[in-house]
């Protein structure tokens, strides 16, 4: 089968002063590669921008850089910044002295999008901080603008606003197209879904904000728990009534029937001030009410009285102003402000355009929302990955589709031509193939047992909007098994795209499907990789995933640098453990986020830092037809937690970052993990290079979540660990090491998984199951090496143990492996197939060399493009 060859061709353009280094090996010394708040300008000095328009961005002044609230509901603890006093200047020209063709502008935010795309060539620019009328300019920066004909250059705000209708409705349907929209909806199943739900709502009594359950507050031990509990319980009421009311509003748009209008207006006016109740917590609740008020204003504009319109405008003004005050001079500089990215920016955007021209504040809201989208959205980087992981990725679904689709409808410009979306299709597919468990990264990944209906709806939208046939095949394979699968997402707060499907009449494209994809894909900026053996039959697919990320473990990311997971038949085997009970709950922090919960390595029993400081990266990778390779570097990930934001979170959650809990300084100098994908055999080879400045011990970890592991140490050459999927799959790991290993297995978490937060509708708190943990601890040594062969296969076909030949080579799965696991000599390995012309070799400090089909590929370390 013909496969495309994917080789690392990324060039570094960030603030790490190492790009001139000639050695194949790069040793990083930076405290972090990313920052919670922007620390570098964009574009970086001497950067070449070829694929999109130039958006100028720069750091906030030092005194105005908030860390953000440690948690939702703790905004009162954040340093207050008088944003009205923040002002900036920018100037740019193709003349380094700024004397010819100078463009200069004032801005209230630390970014600026030129009204017209810059012409190809070299440009010079400066940003300035304005204080009491005096401007402090940055150094002169240089950017080269490429002349790619495929460059993404969306319209300016001025062009967009000229297309905003002066009539209502204008957001969820345009008044002039309303009749035809209703007609086009008649043959679509989504229409009936909304009407069925709306009719059910009309027959059901409405809940009240007084129904918020506060009964457990007395049993909670700190303010974090109390706030989290009330946020969850108030969202239980408000989210339910928001979706009910939204169903009725959408039913009215689909029918123009008065019964829906009357019921929806009554509900919105009942809920309008629920956010003022003392038991209502969290920005999602406030944004839900803003969403309903703006939907009602836009949809029922012609039915509302002047007094009702005024009341809704006042509510929109109050809630929208609060959101804008929070967003501006914060969101645009933040690495990834979760709730704003997920939902609340989308809600403010739709509210702003609903009242544009009728509420003066909407002038600045539309300006900010549109231009910050162009500057920062839709993705966090170019490679299309999502650093927060698969569970929290889908919480961004409506934002990623509805906002640019709204802009596309207004202007006629294709906002989905942003190259990020094509890359994101690859992330969405490779990190969770059809009917398979997620890759195992990010908070709550345990809950994602198969691509959910939101994910399928997202791929459906991207297939139609970008013409991506891989996404289309993914959707078809799902819907042939369960035709109404996407209905499960109906009125899901962050993920329902049923309304998009009513608006969009494009069919799923035809063309190459999943079997035309390469076996593996790497996202170097996000720090993720995954490889498969069978795209066509999930039941026979042996998959593995890997993470070593410049984002570290901030936000919803985990401290799992250089960690891998294995899967068979779509079910996890060796897999990240622990439960996401709450963002900073003790179990969540010490057993789910912390390194001890993942298939990686502890140094002197200590794990990786929490925050952007606990970072890894992927220096080299290769995805070919017969072999694949990923190198992760977690040398800088370990040590004491130093992030001010995470120290504050720990303090408020009563989580101590102590040696007893797994954090301390360690003498680690190098931790590089090589993983070789040995064709479609189900075998992978893992080689760990470990070195410290003084003798240290190294603990190799494996975890399972379905069934216990079995451990066999009878063979004096290796330790054999078998993990089971519980559904007919197995991974057999054969661990070779520099010396004897002290092993231990347990089914107990370091901290019990106590559910104090997540009750069902009847108030029952489900119990979280235990997982199984294997640890193999080395003796103390400055240098140590592990070499692990893992065979992932169907349990009915028992694994054959590796054969150790007389010359010390290892034979496994049709491959011959020569590897140095001794502490003496260079770290090195050589692997070749016994059946085909393919090999890979590595020696410490030198290039990795792959020979495949007569072609040689030599890989040196390459830093990915990073900014913030």
Describe each region flagged by the PLM.
Residues 170, 580-868:
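CBM-like, beta-strand-rich accessory domains located in the C-terminal region of large
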Residues 72-75, 79-120:
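Recognizes extended acidic, P/S/T-rich segments that occur
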Residues 22-76:
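Pro/Thr/Ser/Gly-rich low-complexity, intrinsically disordered linker/stalk tracts
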């Amino acid at each position: 089968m013909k496969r495309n060859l994917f080789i690392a061709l990324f060039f570094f353009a960030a603030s790490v002063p190492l790009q001139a280094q000639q050695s194949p090996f790069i040793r990083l010394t930076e405290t972090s590669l990313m920052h919670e708040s922007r620390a570098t300008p964009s574009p970086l000095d001497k950067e070449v921008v070829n694929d999109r328009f130039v958006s100028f961005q720069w750091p906030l002044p030092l005194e105005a850089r908030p860390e953000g609230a440690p948690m939702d509901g703790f905004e009162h603890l954040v340093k207050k910044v008088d944003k009205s006093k923040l002002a900036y200047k920018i100037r740019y020209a193709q003349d380094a002295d700024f004397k010819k063709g100078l463009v200069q502008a004032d801005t209230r935010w630390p970014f600026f999008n030129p009204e017209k795309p810059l012409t190809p060539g070299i440009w010079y620019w400066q940003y300035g901080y304005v204080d009491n009328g005096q401007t402090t300019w940055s150094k002169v920066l240089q950017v080269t603008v490429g002349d790619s004909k495929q460059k993404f250059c969306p319209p300016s705000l001025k062009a967009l606003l000229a297309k905003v209708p002066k009539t209502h409705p204008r957001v969820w349907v345009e008044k002039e197209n309303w009749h035809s929209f209703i007609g086009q909806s008649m043959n679509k199943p989504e229409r009936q879904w909304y009407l069925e739900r709306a009719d059910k709502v009309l027959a059901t009594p409405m809940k009240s904000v007084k129904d918020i359950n506060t009964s457990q507050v007395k049993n909670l031990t700190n303010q974090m728990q109390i706030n989290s509990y009330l946020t969850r319980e108030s969202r239980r009421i408000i989210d339910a009534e928001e979706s009910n009311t939204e169903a009725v509003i959408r039913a009215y748009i689909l029918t123009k029937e008065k019964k829906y209008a009357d019921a929806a207006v009554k509900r919105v006016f009942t809920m309008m001030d629920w956010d003022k109740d003392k038991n209502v917590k969290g920005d999602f609740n406030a944004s839900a009410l803003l969403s309903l008020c703006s939907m009602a204003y836009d949809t029922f504009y012609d039915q509302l009285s002047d007094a009702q319109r005024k009341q809704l405008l006042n509510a929109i003004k109050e809630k929208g102003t609060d959101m804008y005050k929070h967003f501006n001079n914060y969101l645009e500089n933040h690495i990834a402000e979760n709730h704003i990215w997920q939902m609340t920016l989308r809600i403010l955007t739709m509210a702003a355009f609903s009242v544009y021209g009728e509420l003066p504040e909407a002038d600045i809201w539309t300006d900010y929302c549109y231009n910050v989208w162009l500057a920062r959205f839709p993705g966090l980087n170019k490679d299309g990955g999502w650093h927060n992981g698969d569970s929290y990725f889908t919480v961004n679904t409506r934002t990623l589709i509805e906002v640019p689709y709204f802009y596309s409808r207004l202007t006629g410009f294709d906002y989905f031509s942003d190259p990020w979306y094509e890359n994101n299709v690859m992330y969405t597919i490779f990190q969770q193939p059809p009917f398979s468990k997620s890759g195992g990264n990010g908070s709550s990944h345990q809950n994602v047992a198969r691509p959910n209906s939101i994910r399928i709806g997202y791929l459906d939208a991207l297939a139609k909007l970008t013409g991506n046939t891989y996404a289309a095949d993914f959707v078809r394979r799902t819907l042939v098994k369960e035709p109404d699968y996407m209905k499960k997402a109906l009125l899901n707060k962050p993920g329902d795209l049923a309304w998009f499907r009513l608006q969009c009449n494009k069919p799923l494209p035809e063309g190459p499907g999943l079997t035309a994809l390469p076996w593996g894909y790497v996202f170097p900026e996000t720090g993720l990789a995954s490889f498969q053996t069978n795209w066509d039959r999930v039941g026979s697919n042996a998959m593995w995933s890997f993470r070593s990320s410049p984002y570290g473990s901030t936000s919803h990311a985990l401290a799992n640098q250089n960690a891998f997971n294995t899967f068979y038949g779509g079910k996890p085997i060796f897999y990240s453990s622990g439960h996401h009970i709450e963002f900073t709950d003790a179990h969540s922090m010490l057993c789910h986020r912390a390194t001890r919960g993942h298939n990686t390595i502890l140094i002197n029993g200590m794990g990786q830092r929490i925050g952007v400081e606990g970072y890894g990266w992927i220096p080299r990778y290769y995805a070919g037809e017969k072999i694949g390779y990923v190198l992760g570097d977690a040398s800088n990930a370990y040590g004491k937690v130093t992030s001010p934001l995470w120290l504050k979170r720990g303090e408020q959650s009563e989580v101590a970052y102590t040696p007893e809990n797994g954090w301390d300084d360690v003498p680690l100098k190098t931790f590089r993990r090589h993983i070789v994908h040995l064709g479609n055999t189900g075998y992978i080879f893992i080689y760990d290079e470990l070195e410290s400045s003084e003798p240290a011990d190294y603990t190799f970890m494996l975890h399972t979540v379905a069934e216990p592991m079995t451990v066999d140490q009878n063979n004096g050459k290796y330790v054999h660990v078998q993990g089971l999927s519980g559904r007919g799959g197995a991974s057999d790991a054969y661990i070779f090491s520099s010396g004897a290993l002290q092993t231990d297995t347990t089914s107990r978490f370091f901290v019990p998984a106590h559910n104090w937060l997540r009750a069902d509708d009847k108030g029952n708190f489900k119990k979280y199951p235990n997982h199984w943990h294997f640890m193999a601890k080395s003796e103390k040594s400055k240098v140590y090496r592990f070499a692990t062969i893992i065979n992932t296969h169907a349990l009915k076909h028992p694994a054959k143990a590796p054969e150790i030949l007389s010359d010390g080579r290892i034979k496994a799965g049709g491959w011959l492996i020569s590897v140095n696991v001794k502490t003496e000599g260079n770290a090195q390995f050589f692997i070749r197939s016994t059946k085909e012309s393919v090999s890979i070799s590595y020696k410490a400090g030198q290039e990795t060399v792959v020979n495949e089909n007569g072609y040689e590929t030599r890989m040196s370390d390459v830093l990915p493009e990073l900014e913030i």
